[in-house]
Structures are given as C-alpha cells and as structure tokens.
C-alpha cells in the first residue's frame, strides 16, 4: 500500500451507539493481522492550569493533564490499524478502513470546555448535537474495548503523537476512575493496558532535522492527509502514515527501545526522571 493515499481509497467508518457492536467485531477480527494501532482523540480543550510548586516541568504537565482529563469528557476517538509493511485492513470491501468513534457524554449546555477548542471542532465538521443524540455510551465502549484484543496485549503496538491526553482519556474510560495522582502510577496503568507505545513526538528527538506538530511533520515527510483535520479518524490515519515514513527514513531495526515514553511526561518505564 502506498503512503500516498487518495480520499476515494479510504473509508472512515463512523461509529455510533447503534453500530458499535458490529464495528468492534470487525476490529476484533483485524487486530491480529494489523497490530499497529494509531490513535487520536478529540476533547474539549484545556480549561484549568494547576497552581503551586512542582519539582519539574514534567510534574506540572502531568498535573495539568490529570486535572483536565478528570473533569472533561472525550468527544471522539480515531483508530487506524496497519501491519508491519504499513498495509491497512479492508474488511471485505474495496476501501481501506479507518474507525472514528463518536461519544455522547459531552454536553455543550452543561459541561465546561475551552471555547476555541469547541469552535475548532465545530468548524471541522463535528456535530455535537448528533453526538449527544446518537453517540456511544462510554461504559459500553469500555467493556467492548476490554475484550477486543487491542488492549492488555503486548503484541499490539500503539502509535501516537504527543499523546499524554489521548492515553489519559482512554485510561479514564477503561478504568472508570479518575487518573492517579502520580506520574509513576499513571505509567504503571499505561504499561498494563498499552504495553507497547510509540510517541512520534518522542521519536523525533532522534531525528535531528525534524520539528513541529503532526501536520508540520507530515508535510516535511511528504505524507498527505486524507479526510478532515481535527477529526480523530483522519488524524489517526495521518499519525499511522507519518510513523511508517519516519520509521523507514530514520530508523534501522526494531524500535522497541524507544517505546513506553510519552513526550512531555517525565516517567520512563515507571521511574520518575530526575
């Protein structure tokens, strides 16, 4: 499969509460053959900043992440599956399949949010009213995700970009609890639910000429976007293709020694970085 995908070769499968079971059944069928899972979330922004004294920037970043994830709700999750060669599943169709999960819990009328973030999501085509009406029940999704084979599985490689918040929202959903107080405990949960994680923003540290966010990196690597920016399905596909191009161009051999690190957080393999 070429990294230069065309819009008409991709099907972004919109998942709502009424088709959640059948789409999760498809995912269960593809994960063994396509064990690289690129992930992106959309959420209502960052609404609070902690005050006080912190030992490090990483401690401050985690406290900010924890506080916001605990009071906010995920709006959308995108998943793109691929294999070692970068091929995507077709699920018996003539198109490559990407999944976009739409959640119901966020309420524009009663929940706190960052106005600029919500306006950006609206401009990107996310219909918050439809999410409220037809969106997925998070607890039901968590139950299906737990039995899907994509979490708690060391053979699955999670691929992300600057993904502390993405994993924060998924952990909150999977555990039905607020995030732990300490980074060390947070990473213990990461290691249980997502044993193999690659954060592209961390990998970029080892590629001297690369910088910027996901869109800038994709542009530098000549990876074209399919779909709409700031929608989780399209962003997860761009993450997947960018990871593949980065791996091919800058790394030789397995990447395992780079796994388990989330950019901006000061914990590696459960140990707080000094």
Curated annotation (Swiss-Prot):
Keyword terms of this UniProt record: Cytoplasm, Exonuclease, Hydrolase, Metal-binding, Nuclease, Nucleus, RNA-binding, Transcription, Transcription regulation
Residues noted as binding a divalent metal cation in the record, renumbered to the chain: 40, 42, 166, 235
Transcription is among the record's keywords: yes
Top EC category: hydrolase
Cofactor or coenzyme needed: a divalent metal cation
EC numbers on record: 3.1.13.4
InterPro entries per UniProt: CNOT7/CNOT8/Pop2, RNase_CAF1, RNaseH-like_sf, RNaseH_sf
Transcription as UniProt keyword: yes
Tissue expr: Expressed in flowers.
Positions of disulphide bridges: none
Catalysed reaction, written as an equation: Exonucleolytic cleavage of poly(A) to 5'-AMP
Subcellular location: Nucleus; Cytoplasm
GO CC terms, sorted: CCR4-NOT complex; cytoplasm; nucleus
Role summary: Ubiquitous transcription factor required for a diverse set of processes. It is a component of the CCR4 complex involved in the control of gene expression.
Listed PANTHER family: CCR4-NOT TRANSCRIPTION COMPLEX SUBUNIT
Subunit structure comment from the entry: Component of the CCR4-NOT complex, at least composed of CRR4 and CAF1 proteins.
Family: Belongs to the CAF1 family.
Protein name: Probable CCR4-associated factor 1 homolog 6
Source organism: Arabidopsis thaliana
